[in-house]
Amino acid sequence: MNVPWENAHGGALYCLIRGDEFSAWHRLLFQRPGCAESVLACRHFLDGSPVARCSYPEEYHPCVISRIALLCDSVGWTADVERISAWLNGLDRETYELVFAAIEVLEEEGPALGCPLVDTVRGSRHKNMKELRPGSQGRSEVRILFAFDPARQAIMLAAGNKAGRWTQWYDEKIKAADEMFAEHLAQFEDTKPKRRKRKKG
């Protein structure tokens, strides 16, 4: 994860982190032993960009970048299965276990996970739309369309068995997944801190 650094002076380092990364980084930092005392203050700039002021000694400044970047990279990914919960509840036990085994791997690996478990979807208007391909029972071909959002969540959007309906299945599911993810992103933007306009002095 690329963490842009602003400046350092007076024995403290100031780091500027994008809003979608800040909450996860801030939460992780305070959960790590020995890190709580390193953070003196956290606040938001007027434009909504969060800044963290860290009290690492001056001599550690060259190391802080890699240390904080490592903390950011170690923040886990999570899967949001709310939109496919009805489908999940209708699965037989073996298929259910195979699906959740695949989801657990996805949460561990994040966007780095590739074939054969994850593949890119063609025809979606979202460049990061992918499909999860868990193991299947018999002749079934289970697929789950998902996309990662800025909050490090894999949003599970549409799922089903595409066996025997290869092209038709994608035509139907991708369209639905596109709409759901667009709606999710819009809601995500609405919850972000609004940029304040500076008053003319």
From Swiss-Prot:
This protein's record includes keyword Cytoplasm: no
Signal sequence range = none
List keywords of the entry alphabetically.
Toxin-antitoxin system
What highest taxon heads this organism's lineage? Bacteria
What is the name of the protein in this document? Answer: Putative toxin HigB2
In UniProt terms, what function does this protein have? Putative toxic component of a type II toxin-antitoxin (TA) system. Its cognate antitoxin would be HigA2.
TM region(s), chain numbering: none
Please state, per the UniProt record, what induces or represses the expression of this protein: Induced in persister cells in response to D-cycloserine.
Q: Which family, according to UniProt?
A: Belongs to the mycobacterial HigB family.
